[in-house]
Amino acid sequence: MTAQNIDGKAIARAIRTTLSDKVKARKEAGQRIPGLAVILVGLDPASQVYVGSKRKACEEVGFLSQSFDLPDTTSEDDLLALIDRCNEDPAIDGILVQLPLPAHIDSSKVIERIRPDKDVDGFHPYNVGRLAQRIPVLRSCTPMGIMTLIRSTGVDTYGLDAVVVGASNIVGRPMTLELLLAGCTTTTCHRFTKNLEDKVRQADLLVVAVGKPHFIPGDWIKPGAIVIDVGINRLDDGRLVGDVEFDVAAERAAFITPVPGGVGPMTIASLLENTLYAAENYHD
């Protein structure tokens, strides 16, 4: 068996085209253009790349993108004050604060300062709580994008044994909630998990998000499984690889996401979807 690649680039491109058409229709109807505020604190190279991609995607679909690039010496109070201004700005539908933040800034306090109706990253406890209560509105972008990828396979998720490796607030925990909502029997594995191999081998649907190259050996993959690799790791030779040993896993899985070109583009596409949702449902 050779797995079918789940092409995140193509799916994200189709989403952006749909969003662009909707923005054009709004303009023609005399409605406001959706707006996204993107806040970057410091000069972390990876964060600068991610933020640049998000700003470019905003412009491609016709959103208004407001950029705030702050020095890493910015105080927590100054950052919170900026968020307050964005919260009250009627031209802004979504606020994105690029993580991680400098050590002197409490990221939890920053996330909670963003108004839930402008929390297009889906990190605010209110929005995570709604997902847990099975009434989601603004969903965490990476898990939301992953669910779009899974749906693209045409596989019925109800009753699948799903395993999530990684329990971060950004991916692992909301991913578990999304899979429960999709009817899976879900196991979440983390650093205290015993017998990880046994659990992975049982997975009809595997999502790995740990940030360690080739953390999951390919021969652990259950034949016919769906494998979603969230990791993106740069090796010493410059290659980008995921958290799963791709070449071996691809010989066993039915569907697998490549790295790069799998999950990454979908995170940005979901951010754009959330921003339009906020504009249409909260701010029009």
From Swiss-Prot:
Pfam families: THF_DHG_CYH, THF_DHG_CYH_C. CDD domains: NAD_bind_m-THF_DH_Cyclohyd (cd01080). InterPro entries: Aminoacid_DH-like_N_sf, NAD(P)-bd_dom_sf, THF_DH/CycHdrlase, THF_DH/CycHdrlase_cat_dom, THF_DH/CycHdrlase_CS, THF_DH/CycHdrlase_NAD-bd_dom. Its EC number is 1.5.1.5, 3.5.4.9. Keywords: Amino-acid biosynthesis, Histidine biosynthesis, Hydrolase, Methionine biosynthesis, Multifunctional enzyme, NADP, One-carbon metabolism, Oxidoreductase, Purine biosynthesis. GO terms for molecular function: methenyltetrahydrofolate cyclohydrolase activity; methylenetetrahydrofolate dehydrogenase (NADP+) activity. It catalyses: (6R)-5,10-methylene-5,6,7,8-tetrahydrofolate + NADP(+) = (6R)-5,10-methenyltetrahydrofolate + NADPH; (6R)-5,10-methenyltetrahydrofolate + H2O = (6R)-10-formyltetrahydrofolate + H(+). Pathway: One-carbon metabolism; tetrahydrofolate interconversion. NADP(+) binds at G166, A167, S168, I232. GO terms for biological process: L-histidine biosynthetic process; methionine biosynthetic process; purine nucleotide biosynthetic process; tetrahydrofolate interconversion. PROSITE patterns: THF_DHG_CYH_2. One of its GO terms (cellular component) is cytosol. HAMAP family: THF_DHG_CYH (MF_01576). Belongs to the tetrahydrofolate dehydrogenase/cyclohydrolase family. Homodimer. Catalyzes the oxidation of 5,10-methylenetetrahydrofolate to 5,10-methenyltetrahydrofolate and then the hydrolysis of 5,10-methenyltetrahydrofolate to 10-formyltetrahydrofolate. This is Bifunctional protein FolD.
